Amino acid sequence: MRDMEMRWAAPAPATRGRGRARRRAPDQPSFSSTLLDAICDSMDEGGEDGRTRNAASAAAKKRQEAANSYHYYYCYKPSLAASYRAAPALGSTADCPGRGYFSSSEVEYSLRRLRPIRTSAAGGAGDGAAVARKQRHEQPDVEKTAKTKPGSASARACRRPASPGARLASLLNSIFSGKRPSAQRPACSPDYPEPACSTAPPSSSSSYARRPCHAKTLRTPPTTTTTARARPSRSRTVRFLDIDGKVAVAAAVAGCRRIPVMEVEADTDDGGEESSDASSDLFELDSLAAIAPAGGRDGSHGDELPVYGTTGVGIRRDIGRRRPYGHAPCRSWSRAV
């Protein structure tokens, strides 16, 4: 216990000695005390000069911030960037705050170049009066041109699209006015006499001189509506005309003459012996060769096969003989021309 008390009690004199050694003389004050004394002295001694100096520094700082804000506003707005770039360089590069080559003086100059927008009532009234005066001066000219040029006004009116009501009114007027539209024309003219036509069949000699043509003549419709209603429209007709007229004259002189016409009848099967013989005799070449001659005049049909429908009993003898032109099982009749 006594040793512990001595251990705790021994350092006390040394601590006291150190504290005494750290104490400074009154002529050597500490850094914090000197700083505090300097601040107090500046506040007391400043007075009016200090206040004006602080106000000037604050104003300069505000102007710098405003210039910086205008710089950013002009640079990032496309509509005003051109006017900002077009401003002449009034200040030197030393005045630039460090953001490019623009200075605060350039920004102020560009701001002065902008024209304010007139929003006052007086300015609007003045503009309205000027516009009214212009309209008064221009109105007589418009009236003169409208009087001197009526055709141009009607042409402009025609160019405008018609409304549905106007279209309906024009349609009703055209219906009740009784005027026939120009598109409808009579099929043929009733004033011209009909030419004589020949109904005789064309012969081999005059067939090249005959050609089909339309007996239709177009002419303009009459001007009055009564004649147009009185004359009925005729249908279109097609006639065969003779160009030289020889056939028509000959037919008129000779009167009616009968021309034989051959009408070929179709073969009909009666189901008799002929059909059975015709179907069975197709392959009886030996009997056919015995009955038929050796050939025609030139012997060209001797080796040919028979044709279906020509191997009957009654017509076996005709095989190999040349038939005249137009010969066929038919009936002849004539018609009047």
Swiss-Prot record:
Protein name (record): Protein BIG GRAIN 1-like
Subcellular location: Cell membrane
Recorded GO CC terms: plasma membrane
Family: Belongs to the BIG GRAIN 1 (BG1) plant protein family.
Region ranges (Disordered): 1-32, 120-163, 179-233
Cited InterPro entries: BG1-like
A biological-process GO annotation: auxin transport
Keyword Cell membrane tagged: yes
Organism: Oryza sativa subsp. indica
Compositional bias (Basic and acidic residues): 137-146
Key words of the record: Auxin signaling pathway, Cell membrane, Membrane, Transport
Phosphoprotein recorded as keyword: no
Extent of Low complexity compositional bias: 150-163, 195-209, 219-230
Function: Involved in auxin transport. Regulator of the auxin signaling pathway.
Domain of life: Eukaryota
